[in-house]
Amino acid sequence: MIELHSSPTPNGQKVMIMLEETGLEWKHFDVNIRLGEQFTPEYLKLSPNNKIPAIVDTDGPGGGPYRMMESGAILFYLAEKTGKFLPKDARKRYDTMQWLIFQMAHIGPMFGQANHFNNYAKDNIQYAKDRYNNESIRLYRVLDNQLSTNAWIAGDEYTIADMAIYPWTKGHKDRGIDKAGYPNFMRWFEAMQARPAVQRNNKMADEIRARMAKAAEGKTPIDMFNTQDNAARLSRATGH
């Protein structure tokens, strides 16, 4: 059994897709980051960096429970555990790892900052908006170029690299990404949307959001983007 302690953000969804694709038995444990549940002492035992997602594999290496944080590492772990979606061929395997790390190092940080400055920042900082929006568009071009000669992100096989990138690209329309300018990306995105596991993920993500919203009724949300407050929350939770 895989326990997924998470929220339906892009990083949470990439693991949900992998779990659905592999057919592993799993259960979602809601972590409402808007309420600060990622700072509870219990959750920090799973993810010391107070980020989602985290997993507990009740049948981990050696047969006992094993916990893990960081979505990219979790994808790699689940691929190793099941022997699925990470090619055995050395070149294809390294290609997959390159593009998985590309998502972690570039798409996640840049798309996340664009979303923050477009939708959540208290100050309207045009420089920040331009920087992150333009870099996001550049990254879509990188994807489109890569997909011009490959069926999937890392080559001719569907892999964890595709699962990692897809949830981050659901908002492509907000960046003006369309078939006319990015035909290869759009072909890939539609292929992802057609996968049953991805469709199940999208449905579950909506259900989890609704469940979390209902559970949060009457409660005061935290300011997730106040880094000083977040440091204080972490200190209080850990006693350091």
Predicted regions and their residues:
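GST-like domain detector, emphasizing the conserved glutathione-binding G-site
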Residues: 1-130, 134, 144, 232-240
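Cytochrome P450 catalytic-domain "roof"
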Residues: 52, 146-153
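Residue-level signal for nonpolar/aromatic packing positions in well-ordered secondary structure
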Residues: 55, 74, 143, 162, ...
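Active-site-flanking alpha-helical
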Residues: 79, 168-169, 202
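Short, hydrophobic secondary-structure boundary micro-motifs
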Residues: 86-88, 110-113, 151-156, 199-203
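GST superfamily/GST-like fold recognition
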Residues: 106, 110-115, 153-181, 186-194, ...
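Solvent-exposed, charged/polar functional surfaces in cytosolic regulatory/catalytic domains
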Residues: 135-138, 142-146, 191
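Acidic/histidine-enriched, glycine/proline-rich intrinsically disordered or flexible terminal extensions
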Residues: 205-240
